[in-house]
């Protein structure tokens, strides 16, 4: 399977899941994007189309901490950071959107860290 076909298949999976998952103000959607080198996460209110909180492995707060770490540890730090930012905005519950990626590896590490930091999903 070529890279293009894999990307298209992931987008098809994501669209299929997005038909069922919608974020609201009370329970926004936590969307994950995983690239080859980095991981990004946003907490989104789909009713207004606004991003309430975001974090990534290239975030300024994590700049010194992620250097030299493996990708799994980076994902854990990003999960903790986004959970802390969401909690400061008063968000306690989210709907997890894995973005068409398998729930394993870095995606699972990010989700577990966010749960441990206090987000409920």
Label for each model-derived stretch:
Residues 2-121:
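Ribosome large-subunit tunnel/peptidyl-transferase-proximal elements
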